[in-house]
């Protein structure tokens, strides 16, 4: 999520800090128009580190869902990993296959949804995202520039 649909200003969990990247609204609408499912898979180490909690994360996503629904944009699913091996909060301090580069979040989505994997792709801003996509046999693209233009380019190749 952070660095892909919104600017990553570091541990984004407050509405005031959530700023869409250029072309995101148009790009998400385009994906929906082309009948793509849209999923968010996100590491949320700030939960493990005690910077914010799961309710803060869920509150931000409810705000996001409510605002995007006014534009007829919906995420089909959101998967997140609250874990980090160096977390301050004991229940979240562990290695987990949910945390990217692990691909358990992707596996969970594949189990829950009927998806054409050949036409599926992942956009991320970190090497851990790329490695997760590779483990999941998904086309990967690093997040860059205008999101809408990036989506159009990916769909041309895909």
Show the residue positions of the predicted features.
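Active-site flanking residues adjacent to catalytic metal/cofactor-binding acidic residues
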Residues: 1, 42, 124-125
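Substrate-recognition element of Asp-dependent hydrolases with the DxDx(T/V) motif
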Residues: 24, 28-64, 74-84
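Short, active-site-adjacent cap segments at secondary-structure transitions
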Residues: 5-6, 46-49, 85-87, 129-130
């Amino acid at each position: 999520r952070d660095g892909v649909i919104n600017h990553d200003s570091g541990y984004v969990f407050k509405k005031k800090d959530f700023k869409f990247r250029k072309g995101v609204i148009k790009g998400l609408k385009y994906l929906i128009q082309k009948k793509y499912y849209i999923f968010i898979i996100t590491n949320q180490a700030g939960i493990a580190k005690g910077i914010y909690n799961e309710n803060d994360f869920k509150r931000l996503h409810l705000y996001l869902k409510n605002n995007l629904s006014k534009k007829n944009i919906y995420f089909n699913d959101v998967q997140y990993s609250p874990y980090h091996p160096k977390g301050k909060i004991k229940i979240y301090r562990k290695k987990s296959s949910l945390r990217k580069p692990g691909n358990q979040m992707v596996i969970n989505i594949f189990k829950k949804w009927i998806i054409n994997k050949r036409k599926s792709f992942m956009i991320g801003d970190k090497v851990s995202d790329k490695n997760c996509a590779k483990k999941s046999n998904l086309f990967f693209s690093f997040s860059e520039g205008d999101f809408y233009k990036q989506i159009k380019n990916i769909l041309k190749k895909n």
